């Protein structure tokens, strides 16, 4: 049996992965856990998400599915933050005998849930048509993520996955400041990077794997294998851990990105790879946000932004000039593309002008007056105009990313990038 669960948390607390970790232990009373649990991040632009827009799935071999359904439903009722308007839990249950029949349709549903916008009605209609056991609470929006997580569990061989070690706090500490030795996170990063990432942000001197909300998570270490995330976690010095779970996840895979042939294809609440030419110089707005325009081959334009939380990434963006050919990865909201990564494919030349140099003495000539050229007062040599030089761009073609402190869950870090046709510039 595959169990998918979503939308049990709120902005004020709880975490669907914590419920998953509890069920990993509790459901062993009814059977055997067959594989690592799954943590599936969905479309990051959805406005009614609580925090990270994540669903979980568990796979269990059991002879008593009805007891499993009853137990899971009871635990959701007990732990979900039902008082929160945005919290609308959902759970679905896929029987072993239905894996083959449901695999293709739920795999497609997963892709849609990560890259598109799905209405609750579509999930409920699909559940009804396919005869899937389910339980929705309130408006049942969590059924969308629950179905998608089941689709991921049915397609483990076909998807790119990473892993996350999630450590959870003792319940009496929830809502209090986390007690962690920040230095130990930098030590763990030094020991395990680049097989782990987004533990710390070296440039901005921040620990980024420790949340600040009131949820049960103490920290989360992301990496390429269960072994490496467990190794990194073992190096952390912090308050006592109630329990931990290692999730297989689509985090750090760029699964949310769609290829856009042109700007006309882009829509709000979707994420894209988009190629174009810088058409207006970057400008810094109030609040520190950096905005510039990109034009595609058809002549359409879109505003692109490196917002203040991207910190030092904005310095790179400010170096762009009209004519630079780039490829952007990011999400479109309110008609503006929020940049996650930028590939600088080619740089436009920039020029500077200087007074001509005297061929006799090697010093710069002085202006003889408006429209009268230039003359060396010492040697008497003259020249009709300034001399034009190609300037240094202080920027190289290559692939760049926002710093770890600003990276979205689904964005693929450059340490995972396998391309060898360009210079990679991982943010640290």
Curated annotation (Swiss-Prot):
Domain of life: Archaea
Coarse class of the protein's main subcellular location: cytoplasm
Location in or out of the cell: Cytoplasm
GO molecular function, one term: ligase activity, forming carbon-nitrogen bonds
GO cellular component terms given for this protein: cytoplasm
GO biological process: tRNA wobble cytosine modification
Reactions accelerated catalytically: cytidine(34) in tRNA(Ile2) + agmatine + ATP + H2O = 2-agmatinylcytidine(34) in tRNA(Ile2) + AMP + 2 phosphate + 2 H(+)
Keyword Cytoplasm found: yes
Record keywords, A-Z: ATP-binding, Cytoplasm, Ligase, Nucleotide-binding, tRNA processing
InterPro entries the UniProt entry points to: TiaS-like_TCKD (IPR053870), TiaS_FLD (IPR013696), tRNA_Ile2__agm2C_synt (IPR024913), Zn_ribbon_TiaS (IPR055394)
Function: ATP-dependent agmatine transferase that catalyzes the formation of 2-agmatinylcytidine (agm2C) at the wobble position (C34) of tRNA(Ile2), converting the codon specificity from AUG to AUA.
Protein's name according to its UniProt entry: tRNA(Ile2) 2-agmatinylcytidine synthetase TiaS
Organism phylogeny: Archaea, Methanobacteriati, Methanobacteriota, Stenosarchaea group, Methanomicrobia
């Amino acid at each position: 049996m595959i169990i998918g669960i979503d939308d049990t948390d709120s902005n004020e607390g709880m975490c669907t992965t914590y419920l998953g970790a509890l069920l990993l232990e509790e459901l062993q009373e009814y059977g055997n856990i067959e594989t690592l649990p799954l943590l599936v991040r969905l479309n990051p632009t959805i406005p009614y998400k609580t925090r990270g827009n994540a669903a979980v799935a568990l796979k269990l071999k059991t002879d008593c599915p009805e007891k499993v359904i009853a137990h899971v439903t009871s635990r959701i009722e007990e732990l979900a933050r039902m008082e929160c308007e945005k919290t609308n839990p959902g759970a679905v249950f896929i029987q072993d005998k239905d894996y083959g029949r449901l695999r293709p349709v739920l795999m497609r549903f997963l892709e849609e849930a990560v890259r598109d916008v799905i209405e609750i009605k579509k999930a409920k209609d699909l559940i009804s048509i396919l005869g899937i056991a389910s339980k929705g609470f309130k408006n049942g929006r969590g059924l969308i993520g629950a179905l998608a997580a089941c689709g991921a569990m049915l397609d483990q061989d076909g998807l790119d996955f990473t892993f996350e070690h999630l450590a959870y706090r003792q319940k009496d500490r929830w809502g209090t400041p986390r007690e962690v030795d920040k230095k130990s996170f930098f030590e763990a990063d030094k020991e395990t990077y680049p097989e782990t990432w987004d533990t710390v942000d070296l440039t901005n001197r921040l620990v980024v794997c420790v949340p600040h909300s009131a949820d049960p998570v103490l920290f989360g270490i992301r990496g390429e294998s269960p072994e490496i995330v467990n190794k990194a976690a073992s190096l952390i010095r912090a308050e006592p851990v109630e329990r931990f779970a290692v999730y297989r996840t689509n985090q750090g895979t760029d699964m949310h990105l769609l290829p856009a042939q042109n700007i006309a294809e882009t829509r709000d609440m979707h994420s894209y790879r988009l190629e174009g030419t810088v058409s207006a110089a970057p400008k810094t707005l109030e609040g520190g946000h950096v905005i510039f325009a990109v034009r595609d081959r058809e002549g359409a334009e879109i505003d692109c932004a490196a917002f203040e939380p991207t910190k030092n990434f904005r310095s790179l963006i400010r170096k762009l000039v009209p004519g630079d050919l780039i490829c952007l990865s990011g999400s479109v909201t309110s008609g503006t593309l929020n940049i996650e990564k930028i590939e600088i494919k080619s740089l436009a030349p920039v020029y500077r002008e200087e007074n001509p140099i005297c061929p006799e003495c090697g010093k710069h000539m002085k202006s003889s007056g408006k429209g009268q050229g230039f003359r060396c007062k010492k040697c008497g040599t003259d020249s009709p105009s300034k001399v034009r030089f190609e300037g240094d761009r202080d920027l190289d073609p290559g692939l760049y990313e926002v710093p770890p402190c600003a990276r979205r869950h689904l964005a693929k870090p450059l340490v995972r990038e396998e391309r060898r046709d360009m210079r990679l510039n991982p943010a640290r």
